[in-house]
Amino acid sequence: MNSKAKGGRGEREWAAFCREHGFTDARRGTQFKGGYDSPDCVGLPMIHQEIKRVEKLNVHDAMRQSIRDCEGKAIPIVAHRRNREEWLVTMRAEDWMKIYKGWINDEQGRIYIP
């Protein structure tokens, strides 16, 4: 299987994973030019998704691509997995802290730990 076909398969797998978790609009993005308006997958609001389905990943290169392509308009992530492994998500620590702080606090200052 060539890398383009494997990439497309990974994008479909990630979109299906997102749909299984309640993001029913998740699907592959438009694959014609790169950039903010054409991430690998769409359907997670405010997240620019770079999807990698490879056995060996240079995570720093993949993050640089996601950061560059999101043009500062979304939180860049890299969702990646190897054969027979679970999905992992890589993101900048500053972005993770923003999301985590929002998750643990609501208007009354309660902490949510599901």
Give short role names for the model-derived ranges.
Residues 1-114:
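Catalytic phosphate/metal-binding cores of nucleic-acid and nucleotide-processing enzymes, i.e., regions
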